[in-house]
UniProtKB/Swiss-Prot annotation:
The keyword Secreted applies. This is C-C motif chemokine 20. Belongs to the intercrine beta (chemokine CC) family. The lineage of its organism: Eukaryota, Metazoa, Chordata, Craniata, Vertebrata. One of its GO terms (biological process) is thymocyte migration. Keywords: Chemotaxis, Cytokine, Disulfide bond, Inflammatory response, Secreted, Signal. It is found in: Secreted. InterPro entries: Chemokine_b/g/d, Chemokine_CC_CS, Chemokine_IL8-like_dom, Interleukin_8-like_sf. The keyword Methyltransferase does not apply. Acts as a ligand for C-C chemokine receptor CCR6. Signals through binding and activation of CCR6 and induces a strong chemotactic response and mobilization of intracellular calcium ions. The ligand-receptor pair CCL20-CCR6 is responsible for the chemotaxis of dendritic cells (DC), effector/memory T-cells and B-cells and plays an important role at skin and mucosal surfaces under homeostatic and inflammatory conditions, as well as in pathology, including cancer and autoimmune diseases. CCL20 acts as a chemotactic factor that attracts lymphocytes and, slightly, neutrophils, but not monocytes.
Length: 96
């Protein structure tokens, strides 16, 4: 009976440690925008975008544009040109 309790405790401890290390590795692999580009990007070089929200993982709100050359470029979602490009890309997707 004593051996069974020790095994159960060991299994519970190992589970907690495994969950702890898995959650740490996911957070450290997450890329966040730390600053915005100063350049205005032309929509013809862009293939898509995502939105980054400021939360416990990332410090700033951003629109992340993806280029044909597979680059990710962070832009300020408050800028007029960013809103226009997001609208254009959204319209492009709707037409597909």
């Amino acid at each position: 009976m004593m051996c069974s309790s020790k095994n159960l405790l060991l299994a519970a401890l190992m589970s907690v440690l495994l969950l702890h290390f898995c959650s740490k590795s996911e957070a450290s692999n997450f890329d966040c925008c730390l600053r915005y580009t100063e350049r205005i990007l032309h929509p013809s070089i862009l293939v898509g975008f995502t939105q980054q929200l400021a939360n416990e993982a990332c410090d700033i709100n951003a629109v992340v544009f993806y280029t044909r050359k597979k680059l990710a470029v962070c832009a300020d979602p408050k800028k007029k040109w960013v809103k226009q490009v997001v609208h254009m890309l959204s319209q492009r997707v709707k037409r597909m």
